[in-house]
């Protein structure tokens, strides 16, 4: 029988392996995603972010890093988590169905050149899929954070979008990588804005 200590140690070991596997395929796309967001922000655009459950928390975490700060003081950056307005979420969900809670907000707030960050560990979340469709209708760019094989979202992205797919089967490890990717993108954005990299 495995002890609790061994279980915890196994989580650390698996998390390290998952990050090492992700590093092999995600460094360049992460830079591309950060550059896409920088281009948007420097052209007075905004970033909209969405996801469900833990991915909703990641969307909010990302928006907070942008509007507040990541690690260094800098100007505020326009980012909105579409997961936080309970009145909008419940009204849209009640009147149109849960699949449309993000897409209706994307159509209301998104403009050409803006960026949607859609987060789904499976790549198959119906309301994130609808948000991606709405973003494309608005001529927005999409950065998709997914896992496993990327799901339906990976298949619907355009050449001008960026896929950050964590090639790992376990949801917890995908989520840990998603927050790492979010922090890495925030760092890239800050390094360009503050240090001119």
Swiss-Prot record:
Keyword Nucleotide-binding: no
Similarity field: Belongs to the SIS family. GmhA subfamily.
Record's protein name: Phosphoheptose isomerase
Keyword Manganese on entry: no
Pathway: Carbohydrate biosynthesis; D-glycero-D-manno-heptose 7-phosphate biosynthesis; D-glycero-alpha-D-manno-heptose 7-phosphate and D-glycero-beta-D-manno-heptose 7-phosphate from sedoheptulose 7-phosphate: step 1/1
One MF term in the entry's GO annotations: D-sedoheptulose 7-phosphate isomerase activity
Positions bound to substrate: 52-54, 65, 94-95, 120-122, 125, 175
Cofactor(s), by name: Zn(2+)
């Amino acid at each position: 029988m495995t002890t609790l200590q061994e279980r915890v140690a196994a989580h650390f070991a698996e998390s390290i392996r998952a990050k090492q596997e992700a590093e092999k395929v995600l460094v360049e796309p992460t830079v591309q995603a950060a550059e896409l967001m920088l281009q948007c922000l420097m052209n007075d655009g905004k970033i909209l972010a969405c996801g469900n459950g833990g991915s909703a928390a990641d969307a909010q975490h990302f928006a907070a890093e942008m509007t507040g700060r990541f690690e260094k003081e800098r100007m505020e950056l326009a980012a909105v988590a579409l997961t936080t307005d309970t009145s909008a979420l419940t009204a849209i969900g009640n009147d149109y169905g849960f699949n449309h809670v993000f897409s209706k907000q994307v159509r209301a707030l998104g403009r050409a050149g803006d960026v949607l960050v859609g987060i789904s560990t499976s790549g198959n979340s119906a309301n994130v899929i609808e948000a991606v469709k709405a973003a494309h209708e608005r001529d927005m760019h999409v950065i998709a954070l997914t896992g496993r094989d990327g799901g339906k979202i990976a298949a619907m992205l355009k050449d001008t979008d960026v896929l950050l797919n964590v090639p790992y089967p376990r949801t917890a490890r995908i989520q840990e990588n998603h927050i790492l990717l979010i922090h890495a993108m925030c760092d890239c954005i800050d390094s360009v804005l503050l240090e001119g990299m």
